[in-house]
Amino acid sequence: MNQEKEWVMRVTWKVPEELITKWQGIVRYWMRTRKLDWKYRMHYQITWAWYTMSRYEIPLGQHGSIHVDLYWHLTPEKGWLSTYAEGIQYLSNRDPWYRTELDPATADSLIHTHYFTCFTERAIRKALLGQRFTFCQFPEGHKKTGQVPSLQYLALLAHQNGLRQRSQRSKTGGTRNMGFEQGAVGRMAKRHARRYQSGSQDAFWARAPVPSMELLSGGGRKESHSHARKGL
């Protein structure tokens, strides 16, 4: 008696290898700097999951976790050995236990809620008064399907982007060439120009790409950046 084949269906996004490599580098950066409790498993550590190159497990508190599976060699019968894809699923830890497929926008929203800061309720008031407020570190988390951004969020995001652009212009044009005869003075001026100045209208902060699922799935080729400091 021949055994009947059983198939497991997954929703996947076909992506190039270099995009996976870029996303993995971004994840390693945040796991190292933020001490994120994300788990990385190689293919030999995953059982009953053929064609799985690696897996990232992202805990979401006591409720559940997100599993990001990276696949390779999906169509060996056609000789497409360099075919890569990724699948995202949510696993519940509560009774009744279940798992379900996630789209990148929903996954980004869940990750944003648990791991990255966002605008607070008092951000609008602080922005109007010229006070510092916490920036949104994960803009991709607000692109959930069917979700219409509020006017307050759009205003704060525009203000945040304006501060970032003004900061970039200040960095490029703030230090002038003082000539070869004043090289020591010029170097000293450059060192002081790079520092964070109290009372300045410009906010300087380090930026780093965030581990967005939309970026990994190829939906957003442009990297989304995080702002590690607070703005005005």
UniProtKB/Swiss-Prot annotation:
Further comment: Vif-defective viruses show catastrophic failure in reverse transcription due to APOBEC-induced mutations that initiate a DNA base repair pathway and compromise the structural integrity of the ssDNA. In the absence of Vif, the virion is morphologically abnormal.
> Protein name, please?
Virion infectivity factor
**Domain remarks:** The BC-like-box motif mediates the interaction with elongin BC complex.
Q: Which gene encodes it?
A: vif
This protein's GO CC annotations: host cell cytoplasm; host cell plasma membrane; membrane; virion component
Modification after translation is described as:
Processed in virion by the viral protease.
UniProt-annotated location(s): Host cytoplasm; Host cell membrane; Virion
Write down a Pfam family by its short name: Vif
**Family note:** Belongs to the primate lentivirus group Vif protein family.
Residue numbers covered by motif HCCH motif:
112-142
